């Protein structure tokens, strides 16, 4: 885990090293100061030597300034290094997620990925900043202070060695009890993020059904679980400070007692025993040693908290994308023909491996228009998502242009397959910015032509700023039908060999739907078009109509053929046209 995280330090190695070097300088000055104080007392104050007092006072002042300077510079370098580390780590994680296939994202869930990119990375950033300072400062301080203390009086310094094991055992007990709690807390954070995202995404539904209290209870329940777990962890961590203080006061008390007796016994003569200045130095070193141990305990606390975050981040970084571009990949798509050969497919997460598509056999010639209908849960969307290789089949093969999609360069394949998903997504920015997702180099004329085909140009022209109208996040300031038409125009700008509309005209009226299909037939006759729809009118003029039921193609043919051979198709047709004869002939 540590090795993987260290890869994200990169250009921040220099700042990290400088932070550790300067903090070492701070430690040196801090260890020297008690020795200078001892000399000031023993050789200046006790002997009344004002010249020596002034000289040592200046040295002490310079040492304190040196300590202050090194500490401040170290803090600056540590802040830069930790911020850069967090930036690199977030970039590495985001880049990894961008290369995930849908199945990888299904495994983690969106809320969990967001938590890892935010909360977990922030925990690691704080821990890294503490490590490059405290993990250097505290051990050096403890070692240098111990050496200096033993140089003054080895017997009295044994007190420190007796106290350290007590601290180590106490810290081990605290850490082992709190780590499992923090693991549980971060899993609960994922649930909390999921509830918040779901609520904000569906806030209009929540308010229209007056379900604010219900959503509040859901949020409160999860938040309460986090509170209880954190309380348990903090109750364990609360023992850390009292344990440190107990050891520190015990050391000071023992040093004072035995040190005072030694001074009395030798008459304050450093040559035969211990001087007053040396005792004060020992007390200073006792404080420094125990404070350094307290710093180490804080590091262990942070490591306990961030260990779970580190494991979660590394899990995301180590995840291998299920779908990748193969070696010697095919770099061009010959045409828009599509073949399904004995295809079976199941989702790895959420369906327990149960196939959602079974034994699909189909040939679609280039330039054909294919309609797909079926009830809810008949796997219509799953069927078309295999064409641009958003998922891989379990058995069989899907071919585009006569070549297995698994042999294509992913960018090449998906560049020639435009898909308007069932859930239409627009991004914050102008209409023109959103449309250029289809082709970032598209001219204004090309953009307008695509919108005319998608029947979007008319309503865009009604906006005061036209194509420069700003779209709010998620497209909340345009209607559902307008959003669908903008997404269709965006797909058309790709100039694809295959165009897939996954129930993408459900929010437009039948007349506009017919105009869109008419424009397709006239303007892009050589593009293979797959139209998933709930309305028979949207597909009845297709060259081939597929009827899916429970993950299988139960019927296939033209509208007239299916009216004769498919009970399911005929039932849907009659239910939609009953009492509405115009709908039957909409075109």
Mark where each language-model region is.
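Helix-loop-helix
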Residues: 49-58, 148-162, 171, 232-311, ...
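Alpha-helical transmembrane segments of multi-pass membrane proteins
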Residues: 15-16, 63-82, 129, 133-140, ...
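Transmembrane helix-loop-helix hairpins at lipid-water interfaces of multipass membrane proteins
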Residues: 10, 16-73, 77, 150-155, ...
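An intracellular "coupling" helix at the cytosolic face of ABC transporter transmembrane type-1 domains
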Residues: 11-13, 99-103, 119-132, 136, ...
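ABC-type nucleotide-binding domain
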Residues: 332-587
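Juxtamembrane helix-loop junctions of ABC transporter transmembrane domains
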Residues: 21-22, 29-42, 63-110, 114, ...
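A short amphipathic helical element positioned immediately N-terminal to and/or at the very start
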Residues: 1-11, 113
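Short intracellular "coupling" helices and adjacent cytoplasmic loop segments at the cytosolic face
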Residues: 47-48, 83, 91-115, 119-121, ...
């Amino acid at each position: 885990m540590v090795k993987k995280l260290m890869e994200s330090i990169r250009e921040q190695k220099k700042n990290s090293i400088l932070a550790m070097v300067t903090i070492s300088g701070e430690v040196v000055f801090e260890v020297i100061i008690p020795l200078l104080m001892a000399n000031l007392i023993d050789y200046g104050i006790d002997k009344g030597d004002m010249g020596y007092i002034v000289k040592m006072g200046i040295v002490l002042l310079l040492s304190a300034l040196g300590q202050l300077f090194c500490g401040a510079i170290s803090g600056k370098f540590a802040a830069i290094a930790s911020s850069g580390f967090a930036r690199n780590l977030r970039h590495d994680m985001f880049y990894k997620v961008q290369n995930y296939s849908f199945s990888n994202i299904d495994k983690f869930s969106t809320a969990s990925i967001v938590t890892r990119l935010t909360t977990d990375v922030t925990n690691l950033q704080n821990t890294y900043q503490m490590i490059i300072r405290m993990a250097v400062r505290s051990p050096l301080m403890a070692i240098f202070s111990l050496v200096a203390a033993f140089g003054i009086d080895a017997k009295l310094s044994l007190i420190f060695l007796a106290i350290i094991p007590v601290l180590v055992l106490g810290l081990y007990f605290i850490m082992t009890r709190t780590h499992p709690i923090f693991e549980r807390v971060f899993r609960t954070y994922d649930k909390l993020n999921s509830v918040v995202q779901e609520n904000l995404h569906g806030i209009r539904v929540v308010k229209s059904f007056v379900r604010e209290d219900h959503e509040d209870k859901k949020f409160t329940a999860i938040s309460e679980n986090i509170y209880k777990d954190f309380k348990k962890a903090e109750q364990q961590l609360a023992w850390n400070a009292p344990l440190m203080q107990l050891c520190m006061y015990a050391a000071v008390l023992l040093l004072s007692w035995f040190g005072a007796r030694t001074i009395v016994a030798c008459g304050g003569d450093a040559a035969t025993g211990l001087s007053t200045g040396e005792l004060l130095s020992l007390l200073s070193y006792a404080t420094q040693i125990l404070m350094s141990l307290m710093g180490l305990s804080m590091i262990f606390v942070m490591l306990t908290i961030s260990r779970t975050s580190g494991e979660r981040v590394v899990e995301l970084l180590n995840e291998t994308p299920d779908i990748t571009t193969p070696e010697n990949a095919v770099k061009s798509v010959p045409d828009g023909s599509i073949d399904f050969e004995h295809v079976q497919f199941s989702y790895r997460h959420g369906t327990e491996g149960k196939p959602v598509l079974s034994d699909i056999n189909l040939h679609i010639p280039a330039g054909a228009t294919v309609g797909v209908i079926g009830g809810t849960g008949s796997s219509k969307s799953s069927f078309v998502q295999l064409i641009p290789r958003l998922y891989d089949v379990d058995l069989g093969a899907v071919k585009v242009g006569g070549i297995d999609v698994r042999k294509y360069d992913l960018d090449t394949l998906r560049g020639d397959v435009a898909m308007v998903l069932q859930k239409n997504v627009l991004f914050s920015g102008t209409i023109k910015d959103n449309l250029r997702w289809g082709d970032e180099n598209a001219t204004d004329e090309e953009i307008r032509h695509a919108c005319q085909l998608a029947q979007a140009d008319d309503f865009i022209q009604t906006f005061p700023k036209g194509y420069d109208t700003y779209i709010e996040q998620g497209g909340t300031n345009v209607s559902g039908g307008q959003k669908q038409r903008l997404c269709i125009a965006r797909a058309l700008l790709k100039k694809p060999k295959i165009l897939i509309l996954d129930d993408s005209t459900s929010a437009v009226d039948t007349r506009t739907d017919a105009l869109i299909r008419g424009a397709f037939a006239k303007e892009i006759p050589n593009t293979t078009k797959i139209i998933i729809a709930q309305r028979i009118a949207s597909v009845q003029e297709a060259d081939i109509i597929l009827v899916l039921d429970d993950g299988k193609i139960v019927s296939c043919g033209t509208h007239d053929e299916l009216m004769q051979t498919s009970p399911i198709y005929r039932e849907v047709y009659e239910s939609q046209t009953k009492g509405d004869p115009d709908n039957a002939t909409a075109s």
